[in-house]
A protein has these predicted regions:
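Hydrophobic/aromatic-rich alpha-helical bundle segments in the mid-to-C-terminal region
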Residues: 131, 146-195, 204-222, 230
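Amphipathic alpha-helical linker/stalk segments
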Residues: 67-96, 103, 141-143
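Helix-turn-helix
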Residues: 22, 26-64, 68
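Arg/Lys-rich, glycine/proline-spaced intrinsically disordered segments
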Residues: 6-11
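Amphipathic alpha-helical segments that line or abut small-molecule/effector binding pockets
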Residues: 25, 89-105, 109, 113-117, ...
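Amphipathic alpha-helical segments used for helix-helix packing
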Residues: 103-131, 171-176
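Hydrophobic/aromatic residues within well-ordered alpha-helical segments
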Residues: 62, 69, 73, 92, ...
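Amphipathic alpha-helical packing segments from all-alpha helical-bundle domains
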Residues: 90, 110, 123-149, 156, ...
């Protein structure tokens, strides 16, 4: 009966959002597993359970899709306080911890390695990664530092310095294929980086000494407990 006919209207905003996430999740997984060169748009469409036409309606080519994957991954990046932080060091410490935890996820690590290995053949990947870093890391930190009292004409350079400090240990381990830092190591490095940036080397050194003192005290307590059990 005509009165019972169900019409298919345009997909809702929520439907579109879910489908987009489905496409980008599938694409990130495929790029991470197989590399940029090997993945085809048809494979992504099949993996995401959408038509090739739907995929091409959203992304003109594979590079556009890869670029969208980078932005999609960056949506998990932490945010800094909107207003001027009362404690700049604490805000930057928390941000440093959160950003490294995101970058240390399996998919982020594999995408980073993909860019490193395939950028010689596809230099556009490197440019896309740099643009993504500027948009989702450098620009937000720059804006935060300006609100925290840094001069407008130098805030971006200071933002880059802070990020270099905060990400240095993660970058070193990635470069030399070493185990990624543990949660405790991430927290310690983030605290030292923020202290160095805000207060200089003396503050960072004091934090390092405090960490070492804590390790020694923990070791002494462990030995005392072990002896007591004998």
């Amino acid at each position: 009966m005509a009165g019972n006919t169900i019409r298919k209207g345009r997909p809702s905003a929520e439907d579109s959002r879910v489908k987009l996430a489905q496409i980008l999740d599938a694409a990130r997984d495929l790029f991470s597993e197989r590399g940029y060169r090997a993945v085809t748009m048809r494979e992504v469409a099949e993996q995401a359970n959408v038509s090739t036409r739907t995929l091409y309606n959203r992304y003109a080519d594979k590079f556009s899709l890869f670029n969208a994957c980078l932005s999609f991954g960056a949506s998990a990046f932490p945010t800094l306080p909107v207003a001027n932080a009362n404690d700049l060091e604490t805000a930057l410490t928390n941000f440093g911890i959160a950003i490294v935890k995101v970058l240390a996820t399996d998919s982020s690590v594999r995408l980073s390695m993909l860019i490193y290995w395939e950028s010689a053949e596809f230099p556009e990947l490197l440019r896309a990664s740099e643009d993504n870093q500027r948009k989702h890391l450098v620009d937000p930190v720059t804006a935060f530092l300006k609100k925290s009292g840094f001069p407008s004409d130098t805030a971006e350079e200071f933002a880059k310095l802070y990020l270099a400090l905060a990400l240095s240990e993660w970058q070193r381990r990635m470069t030399y294929n070493q185990p990624l830092p543990t949660q405790k190591e991430i927290e310690q490095h983030a605290a030292r980086a923020a202290a160095m940036f805000v207060n200089g080397a003396d503050a960072a050194l004091a934090k390092s000494r405090s960490d070492k003192k804590g390790k020694v005290e923990s070791l002494v307590a462990h030995r005392r407990t072990s002896r007591a059990k004998i």
